[in-house]
């Protein structure tokens, strides 16, 4: 979607150009999911790129929706930062390890447990 909205064809080397274009158009935060490769975020203060969680993917049908939902939950509590992106990235990673759409969406406890196993920080409370 970021490529379509910005009018710039996506390549591995032009994420920053796409993000800059969207920021200039008035967006506060640009978040681009990269599938198994992770997530890229840019705003006027910082740029963050996280690798994807290594999992055995079974069905990717709900990955994007799960990522967006998880990020929205965090954004209700705090600004987008590395911890927020890790939370959403983790939720999506868990989702792809299961079949189906709605049944694949993890619970909050499942995401917290996975993050703890992977030693990913989670300092905010829900």
Residue ranges and their predicted role:
Residues 2-6:
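A short acidic, helix-capping loop that chelates divalent metal ions and anchors anionic groups
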Residues 7-8, 12-126:
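Conserved phosphate-binding/catalytic region of the ribokinase-like
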């Amino acid at each position: 979607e970021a490529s379509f909205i910005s009018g710039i064809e996506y390549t591995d080397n032009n994420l920053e150009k796409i993000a800059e274009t969207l920021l200039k158009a008035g967006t506060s935060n640009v978040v681009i999911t990269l599938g198994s490769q992770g997530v890229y975020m840019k705003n006027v203060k910082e740029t963050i790129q996280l690798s994807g969680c290594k999992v055995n993917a079974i069905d990717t049908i709900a990955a994007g929706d799960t990522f967006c939902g998880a990020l929205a939950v965090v954004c209700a509590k705090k600004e987008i930062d590395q911890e927020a992106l890790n939370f959403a990235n983790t939720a999506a990673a868990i989702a792809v390890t299961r079949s189906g759409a709605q049944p694949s969406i993890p619970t909050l406890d499942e995401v917290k447990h996975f993050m703890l196993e992977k030693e990913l920080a989670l300092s905010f409370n829900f």
